[in-house]
Design a protein with these regions (language model features):
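Generic enzyme active-site microenvironment
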Residues: 3-5, 118, 179-180
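Asp-based, Mg2+/Mn2+-dependent phosphohydrolase catalytic module
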Residues: 102, 106-107, 121-255
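Active-site neighborhood of HAD-like aspartate-dependent phosphohydrolases
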Residues: 1-41
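A metal-dependent, Asp-based hydrolase signature
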Residues: 38-88
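Charged linear interaction tracts used for macromolecular binding and regulation
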Residues: 77-79, 94, 120
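Short, acidic loop-to-helix structural element flanking the phosphoryl-transfer center
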Residues: 3, 57-61, 88-116
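Short glycine/serine/threonine/alanine-rich loop segments
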Residues: 72, 113, 195
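Small/polar loops that bind or transfer phosphate-bearing groups
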Residues: 12, 117-118, 144
Length: 255
C-alpha cells in the first residue's frame, strides 16, 4: 500500500500560495501588504534559508505566519484560504500533476499496490479539484480531513490490522510506503511503525529521517520502484481501475 499526500505531492504549483497571500493581505496598508507578499516570494525561492519566515513548513504556513505577524486576524485568514480553494477549481489557477509520479502510480496499481490519498484538506471542494486534475483514476481511496499526523497514524493502524476496524488489511509495515512534503504529518507516522518513508524536502528543512529524500517527487520515483519490487508479492491482484470513492473523514478513535 502507498499512502500519498496531496498538496505539494500529487499536485504542485505556487499559484495557490500567491493567491492566498494576496487575498490574506489585501486589507493591510500597502507597506505591510508588501512585507507579506515579498516574504512569501522569498520563502518560495529560498525555503528554510529565507530570512523572512525560516520556520515555515511550507508555503501555506509561510503565508499564515507572515499575515498573522502583520495583523491579519484568524477569520480573515480562513476567508482567504476558502477563497483560494475556490480559485484552485478554476483553469485560471496554474497547477501541475507531476507526470512521472502519475505514471508510476498507474503502474503500481496495475501491479497490485493499493494507493490511498490522505489529505488534511476538507472534503468540501476536494472532489471537483480531483476531477479537474484527473487524479481519481490514480488512487483507490481518498481520505479527506485526515487530521494528520494523528489521523494518519489511525489510518495506518487500520491497514495493519491493529485497530480492529472492519476491513483492516493486515499488511506488514514493510509493505507500506508513505510519501509527502511535510515530514511530521506525512512521513513520521509511517516510519515510526516501520513503513518506507519517501520525503519531498523542497525547502531544505531536513525535519527528520526518511528512507529516501529528494527536493522533488521525481527524485523519489526510483526508490519507490525499488520498494515496490521487494514489498509487493508477484501474485498480487491488480487494483481496480474505477474512480475512487471520496471519504469525507477518517473514523475517529472512538467511532
Amino acid at each position: 500500500m502507498l499512502v500519498t499526500d496531496f498538496d505539494g505531492t500529487l499536485y504542485r504549483g505556487d499559484d495557490p500560495i500567491r493567491h492566498y497571500a494576496r487575498r490574506a493581505a489585501r486589507e493591510l496598508a500597502p507597506d505591510r501588504r508588501r512585507i507579506v507578499l515579498d516574504g512569501v516570494d522569498q520563502y518560495l525561492a529560498m525555503g528554510a534559508a529565507a530570512s523572512a519566515v525560516p520556520e515555515a513548513i511550507d508555503g501555506w504556513e509561510a503565508v499564515m505566519l507572515l499575515a498573522r505577524r502583520l495583523g491579519v486576524d484568524p477569520d480573515a485568514l480562513q476567508a482567504a484560504f476558502t477563497d483560494t480553494r475556490v480559485h484552485m477549481l478554476s483553469e485560471a489557477c496554474s497547477l501541475e500533476v507531476p507526470s512521472g509520479y502519475a505514471e508510476l502510480l498507474q503502474q503500481l496499481r496495475a501491479g497490485g499496490v493499493r494507493v490511498v490519498l490522505a489529505t488534511n484538506s476538507p472534503a468540501e471542494g476536494l472532489d471537483p479539484l480531483l476531477r479537474r486534475l484527473d487524479l481519481l483514476p490514480l488512487v483507490d481511496e481518498v481520505v479527506a480531513g485526515t487530521g494528520k499526523p494523528a489521523g494518519l497514524r489511525r489510518l495506518l493502524q487500520r491497514e495493519l490490522g491493529g485497530s480492529g476496524t472492519v476491513g483492516a488489511a493486515g499488511l506488514a509495515p514493510e509493505r507500506v510506503l508513505v510519501i509527502g512534503d511535510h515530514w511530521r504529518n506525512d512521513i513520521e507516522p509511517g516510519t515510526d511503525i516501520g513503513a518506507f518513508g519517501a520525503y519531498i524536502d523542497r525547502f531544505g528543512r531536513a525535519d527528520g529521517p526518511a528512507d529516501a529524500t529528494a527536493t522533488t517527487v521525481e527524485g523519489l520515483l526510483e526508490p519507490i520502484r525499488k520498494w515496490a519490487a521487494t514489498a509487493v508479492p508477484t501474485t498480487a491482484p491488480a487494483a481496480p481501475t474505477t474512480p475512487a470513492p471520496l471519504l469525507k473523514a477518517l473514523p475517529s478513535e472512538t467511532s
